[in-house]
């Protein structure tokens, strides 16, 4: 992926310098896990029940957009179960032996966390199925006619799989998870709580309005909120007395080109191109990519999802259309009623 995409300030994917920082502010207990009330309540019940029965927790699938706390929840599950945690990711497991090495080193009730589980090699999945269902590992010894299969018993364990692309999971793998949790984007009050908690851990002085200003521009994502907090902290220490209030947060985020709706330069460039160069659309993805000098995949996977979710653009069979919200955001007059009606007649054909 393009370096400028990876280091995008309001990008939800983890950046190279962030794992240690995220660990330092990651909650360890469900009681400290902010937001996702339904998920938190359900997991509390499931964990308590499994603990009372002295059983391993059912296998858990966690899915949702990046930056919402899937890894954090996996760590909390292990901590609440008073179990060990082994962590890996789908692309890392290249051979069946890689998975076998992990499984045979698990202790009873341990948690095996596989991030990006949708990227598992199909051959790895085949090895995983009996391990999940029967806590057994089938290993092939030897090659050719002399090859034979032996079964190894595994201790009862919990697989926690995390993915941003649940639709890419194969049905056999998806069906083996007894617990499936979807993480939603966070509400502003929850993000304010998250910002204030992180500020306390980082010894940053921040008031309610300062936390609110950061939360409103965080695109519903805790990882982005924590990243913006660190950048606003830098600004406050250099340009102010180190304390973050609403005006300091606003000035810092404006300087960083993150506007009140969490849009950055790339978002605004795409939206303004649709409005000014293509009269609000519809415009095909290839034409749009050429107009803003970005790859099609970058637009579809990185820029568009948040804009579609927030209602700034619509995808139709004839192309992308800027909505009324986009015109309002840029304080631009709406197109003529006939043009607007023609565009919005496509609403019934949204992809």
From Swiss-Prot:
SUPFAM superfamilies linked: P-loop containing nucleoside triphosphate hydrolases, Winged helix' DNA-binding domain
Subcellular location: Cytoplasm
Subunit relationships: Homohexamer. Forms an RuvA(8)-RuvB(12)-Holliday junction (HJ) complex. HJ DNA is sandwiched between 2 RuvA tetramers; dsDNA enters through RuvA and exits via RuvB. An RuvB hexamer assembles on each DNA strand where it exits the tetramer. Each RuvB hexamer is contacted by two RuvA subunits (via domain III) on 2 adjacent RuvB subunits; this complex drives branch migration. In the full resolvosome a probable DNA-RuvA(4)-RuvB(12)-RuvC(2) complex forms which resolves the HJ.
Source organism phylogeny: Bacteria, Pseudomonadati, Pseudomonadota, Gammaproteobacteria, Legionellales
Name of a matching Pfam family: RuvB_N
Enzyme class at the top of the EC tree: hydrolase
Residue positions binding DNA: 296, 315, 320
The gene coding this protein: ruvB
GO cellular component, one term: cytoplasm
InterPro entries, A to Z: AAA+_ATPase, AAA_lid_4, DNA_helicase_Holl-junc_RuvB, P-loop_NTPase, RuvB-like_N, RuvB_C, WH-like_DNA-bd_sf, WH_DNA-bd_sf
Protein name in the entry: Holliday junction branch migration complex subunit RuvB
Sequence similarity: Belongs to the RuvB family.
Catalytic activity, reaction form: ATP + H2O = ADP + phosphate + H(+)
HAMAP family, alphabetized: DNA_HJ_migration_RuvB
Binding-site residues for Mg(2+), renumbered to this chain: 71
Record key words, sorted: ATP-binding, Cytoplasm, DNA damage, DNA recombination, DNA repair, DNA-binding, Hydrolase, Nucleotide-binding
Domain notes: Has 3 domains, the large (RuvB-L) and small ATPase (RuvB-S) domains and the C-terminal head (RuvB-H) domain. The head domain binds DNA, while the ATPase domains jointly bind ATP, ADP or are empty depending on the state of the subunit in the translocation cycle. During a single DNA translocation step the structure of each domain remains the same, but their relative positions change.
Region described as Head domain (RuvB-H): spans on this chain: 260-351
Chain sites annotated for binding ATP: 25-26, 67, 70-72, 133-135, 176, 186, 223
GO MF, one example: four-way junction helicase activity
Disulfide bonds: none
Region (Large ATPase domain (RuvB-L)): 1-186
Species the sequence originates in: Coxiella burnetii (strain RSA 493 / Nine Mile phase I)
BP GO annotations: DNA recombination; DNA repair
Start and end residues of each stretch annotated as Small ATPAse domain (RuvB-S): 187-257
Purpose of the protein: The RuvA-RuvB-RuvC complex processes Holliday junction (HJ) DNA during genetic recombination and DNA repair, while the RuvA-RuvB complex plays an important role in the rescue of blocked DNA replication forks via replication fork reversal (RFR). RuvA specifically binds to HJ cruciform DNA, conferring on it an open structure. The RuvB hexamer acts as an ATP-dependent pump, pulling dsDNA into and through the RuvAB complex. RuvB forms 2 homohexamers on either side of HJ DNA bound by 1 or 2 RuvA tetramers; 4 subunits per hexamer contact DNA at a time.
Source superkingdom: Bacteria
EC number: 3.6.4.-
């Amino acid at each position: 992926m393009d370096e400028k995409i990876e280091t995008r300030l309001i990008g939800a994917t983890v950046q190279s310098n962030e794992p240690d920082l995220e660990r330092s502010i990651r909650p360890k207990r469900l009681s400290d896990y902010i937001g996702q009330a339904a998920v938190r309540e359900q997991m509390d019940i499931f964990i308590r029940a499994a603990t009372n029965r002295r059983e391993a927790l059912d296998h858990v699938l966690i899915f949702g957009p990046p930056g919402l706390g899937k890894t954090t929840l996996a760590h909390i599950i292990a901590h609440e179960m008073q179990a060990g945690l082994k962590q890996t990711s789908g692309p890392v497991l290249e051979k069946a032996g890689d998975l076998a090495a992990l499984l045979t080193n698990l202790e009873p009730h341990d948690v095996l966390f596989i991030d990006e589980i949708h990227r598992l090699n199909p051959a790895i999945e085949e090895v995983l199925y009996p391990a999940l269902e029967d806590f057994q590992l089938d290993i092939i010894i030897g090659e050719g006619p002399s090859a034979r299969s032996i079964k190894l018993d595994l201790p009862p364990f919990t697989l926690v799989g995390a993915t941003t692309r649940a639709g890419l999971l194969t049905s056999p793998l998806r069906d083996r998870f007894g617990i499936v949790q979807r993480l939603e984007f966070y509400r502003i009050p929850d993000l304010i709580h998250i910002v204030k908690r992180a500020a306390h851990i980082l010894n940053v002085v921040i008031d309610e309005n300062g936390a609110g200003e950061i939360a409103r521009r965080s695109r519903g994502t805790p990882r982005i909120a924590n990243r913006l907090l660190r950048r606003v902290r830098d600004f406050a220490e250099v340009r102010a007395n180190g304390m973050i209030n609403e005006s300091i947060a606003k000035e810092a985020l404006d300087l960083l080109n993150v506007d009140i709706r969490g849009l950055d330069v790339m978002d605004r460039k795409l939206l303004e191109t649709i409005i000014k160069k293509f009269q609000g659309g519809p415009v095909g993805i290839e034409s749009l990519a050429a107009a803003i000098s970005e790859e099609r995949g970058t637009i579809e996977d990185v820029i568009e999802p948040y804009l579609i979710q927030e209602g700034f653009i619509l995808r139709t069979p004839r192309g992308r259309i800027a909505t009324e919200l986009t015109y309002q955001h840029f304080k631009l007059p709406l197109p003529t009623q006939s043009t607007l009606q023609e565009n919005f007649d496509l609403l019934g054909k949204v992809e």
